[in-house]
């Protein structure tokens, strides 16, 4: 069930916020992106099963659509995040759409263009369901995620649009994750899991409220 947490928009935004970067690429490391990411260990079996089921469904569909299109992760997610592909319309002049059409035409044993589009739309639907399941696991159902295409300010200006949660939801989620990180850290200190000599937690590493610098002060700025 941890897979659903780590594939969620919550974790993606957390990793971009607190992970280190090289140019505009994230350096995804356990210490910066996983060890600091707060996941409750006291989830009910019902919630764990829900997370496991949606995580498996998402993983399996992604694997099958990639195999059917004969595309790797990067190109698949380029399509996933392309606002030229929606349930209402397809912009057949968009470079991602044109590239997909040409690829499917020249590559043997692939699915049709329409099937590929439906597969991408289904992947988005599953991602929304996974985010909602993670939201429920945290008990933050007062937050409206409002999935759609939004600009994210940690990417280059010419490539900022992503299919993700609303900027207001992102800001609130990051705020609560930071608070939860601190709460878990304090609980670990009380349980003797904090190594004072090394000043790091043996389980969940604490992260501080960000000041000016990479990512900006997300909690006090409109995004």
Locations of regions flagged by a protein language model:
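S-adenosyl-L-methionine
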Residues: 1-223
